[in-house]
Amino acid sequence: MHSVMETLFSQLIQEIGEDVSREGLVDTPKRAASAFRFLNSGYHQSLDHVLNNAVFEADSEDMVIVKDIELYSLCEHHLLPFIGKCHVGYLPQGKVIGLSKIARIVEMYARRLQIQERLTKQIADAIQTAVNPRGVAVVVEAKHLCMMMRGVEKQNSVMTTSSMLGLFRKQSSTRAEFLDLIGRK
């Protein structure tokens, strides 16, 4: 028995002129459906689930940064991947997040149909909601296959987006320190 998604992938393969019963394609609808579910698994997660009580009391007020978090997502316009990295910083105000949870927050929002601008803001808003810090900074740098494989076909372009909340938005020196520490000036 095929899932609706498997049937749709089978129809898609046939629509482009391929024979879905060909040896190399027989199991492709099943594999593609499984991959698509995985790539969009973020819809079935919540911030509370991802945090899993890993928010801790802490006296630290110094900047916390996790940089070079690898990410991939699907562009909501063409369903093609964009691949890059995310840098997250925040200024604690009595609470910190378990280190791995920051990467999991990035992953939760990246595993949805996205535009990079929204992804960046969702990550920042989630950190803000999780620990109510004095500020949050998120920078995402990514290559978009929708721009590399089709359309203008530019292979080396990188899109950079940022979301700055609290002191990162209000204080240029705080923002500059973050950008310097992640290697962006």
Curated annotation (Swiss-Prot):
EC number: 3.5.4.16
Binding site for Zn(2+): C75, H78, C146
Keyword line: GTP-binding, Hydrolase, Metal-binding, Nucleotide-binding, One-carbon metabolism, Zinc
InterPro entries referenced in this protein's UniProt entry, alphabetically: GTP-CH-I_C/QueF (IPR043133), GTP-CH-I_N (IPR043134), GTP_CycHdrlase_I (IPR001474), GTP_CycHdrlase_I_CS (IPR018234), GTP_CycHdrlase_I_dom (IPR020602)
Molecular functions (GO terms): GTP binding; GTP cyclohydrolase I activity; zinc ion binding
SUPFAM superfamilies given in the database record: Tetrahydrobiopterin biosynthesis enzymes-like
Keyword hit for Zinc: yes
Gene Ontology CC entries for this record: cytoplasm
GO terms under biological process: one-carbon metabolic process; tetrahydrobiopterin biosynthetic process; tetrahydrofolate biosynthetic process
Signal peptide interval: none
Broadest EC class assigned to this enzyme: hydrolase
Annotated metabolic or biological route of this protein: Cofactor biosynthesis; 7,8-dihydroneopterin triphosphate biosynthesis; 7,8-dihydroneopterin triphosphate from GTP: step 1/1
Reactions catalysed: GTP + H2O = 7,8-dihydroneopterin 3'-triphosphate + formate + H(+)
Oligomer and partners: Toroid-shaped homodecamer, composed of two pentamers of five dimers.
NCBIfam families (alphabetical): folE, PRK09347.1-2, PRK09347.1-3
Similarity annotation: Belongs to the GTP cyclohydrolase I family.
Name this polypeptide is given: GTP cyclohydrolase 1
